[in-house]
């Protein structure tokens, strides 16, 4: 029997409207809030892959840098001013893996921020703090390597534990004060009030930085970078000269003091090479992001979201790279990892273990 549409308590328009509202609500971060951000979710397959890739990087950053810190702090043979700088750098990378990457993973993959406005600012502040802390640490490490390679016999009297402590304090204090004051005073958003108002919604966590502060941020990255590049160019020139001198001396009978100096210089050159690779990896990871931030600020935020996310995660992955570099180039680190993983560091006097091959 045919039925008339008017006999139903709803019509087709109301059905379509309700279906449309249902579809829209499923694309909102918070379905029952009018000011909710709109989600742009991935399909299940890519979402699973992205969670796995980003999650693995966070776990690697935490576990790898924890191994670096444990190795340096536990084994007395590694207690040196230079290694304390490396341990502090590992701490910055560890904190990126703990306080930044997991939350950024959810925001990047799910398209929403579910952790509240308060932690949004903390998260952004941590992100900026640990980035600049790493830059300052690497800058001081490059200066340390220059002194060690240029004059290894006097190095220990110049770069003491006290000097290392001051470098570590400066790196952390300046980066934390700068990032938190910049974001919590609202200075970074001055002149962008209309943009911030348009972007503000429940479930969003976007950092808006005006042109002036983007330029200052870039300078804070560029100046230490130029210092590192200048210092390491000198380090490799000195290393090349020392290698040539050792080759000449090897053809003659060397005094015991000369032989000792050569051994020390060789060890310092290897350390400088490894840390030079660490610096290069950092620059390759972060430079694209900083260049894009300059382009965005002065050309009207033209970077597509997916490109921005790629650049951010390339930078984040740097926090997981340093332990891999150490493991590849440092036999002592591989030996320390083995002792830690097997639980042998719990044995009595394990801190006195010899990690360096004869």
Curated annotation (Swiss-Prot):
Task: Classify the source by domain of life.
Answer: Eukaryota
Keyword Cell membrane belongs to the record: yes
> Cytoplasmic side of the membrane: what ranges?
69-83, 144-166, 234-274, 334-358
**Localization (cell):** Cell membrane
Q: How does it sit in the membrane?
A: Multi-pass membrane protein
Q: What is its main location?
A: membrane
Which keywords belong to this entry?
A: Cell membrane, Disulfide bond, G-protein coupled receptor, Glycoprotein, Membrane, Receptor, Transducer, Transmembrane, Transmembrane helix
Q: Give me the Extracellular side stretches, as residue ranges.
A: 1-47, 105-121, 188-212, 296-309
Record-annotated membrane-spanning stretches:
48-68, 84-104, 122-143, 167-187, 213-233, 275-295, 310-333
In Gene Ontology terms, what is one molecular function of this protein?
A: trace-amine receptor activity
Gene3D superfamilies recorded: Rhodopsin 7-helix transmembrane proteins
Q: Which InterPro entries match?
A: GPCR_Rhodpsn, GPCR_Rhodpsn_7TM, TAAR, TAAR_fam
Biological processes, Gene Ontology terms: G protein-coupled receptor signaling pathway
SMART domains (alphabetical): 7TM_GPCR_Srsx
Extract the Pfam families matched here. 7tm_1 (PF00001)
Claim: Disulfide bond is one of the keywords in the record = yes
User: According to the record, which residues are glycosylated?
Assistant: 34, 210
S-S bonds = 37-201, 120-205
- Extract one GO cellular component term from the record: plasma membrane
Per its database record, what is this protein's job? Olfactory receptor specific for N,N-dimethylalkylamines trace amines. Trace amine compounds are enriched in animal body fluids and act on trace amine-associated receptors (TAARs) to elicit both intraspecific and interspecific innate behaviors. Ligand-binding causes a conformation change that triggers signaling via G(s)-class of G alpha proteins (GNAL or GNAS).
Domain remark from Swiss-Prot or TrEMBL: In addition to the well known disulfide bond common to G-protein coupled receptor 1 family, trace amine-associated receptors (TAARs) contain an unique disulfide bond (Cys-37-Cys-201) connecting the N-terminus to the extracellular Loop 2 (ECL2), which is required for agonist-induced receptor activation.
What family is reported?
Belongs to the G-protein coupled receptor 1 family.
Q: What is this protein called?
A: Trace amine-associated receptor 7e
State the species of origin.
Rattus norvegicus (Rat)
Higher taxonomy: Eukaryota, Metazoa, Chordata, Craniata, Vertebrata
